[in-house]
Amino acid sequence: MEWTAKKIRELIAEDKLYRFYKSTEWKALRDKILKENHYECEWCRDRGKISKAETVHHVQYVKNHPDLAMSEFYWFKGKRYRNLIALCHD
């Protein structure tokens, strides 16, 4: 399935966004981000601590930016930023 902004908005309206997070496409992208970061929490690593990353966070919230749900990066004022970051549960 291709996850379009329209489809994501429909899931949000139906209170079924969990379907996106259970999709094969999201799980593959999530696993890619975790692997690229060696399963380390980026937030903790930036503070000198090593913690196991267990989830991937959207910097640009899916409910606010459904068009970026599957985007690793986003642009703001001409600069590229990471949209998906590996995090622990702490």
What is each of the regions a protein language model found here?
Residues 1-28, 45-52:
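A boundary/linker detector
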Residues 26-32, 72-77:
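Short, intrinsically disordered, charge-biased short linear motifs at domain edges
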Residues 27-60, 88-90:
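Short cysteine-rich loop/turn motifs with clustered Cys
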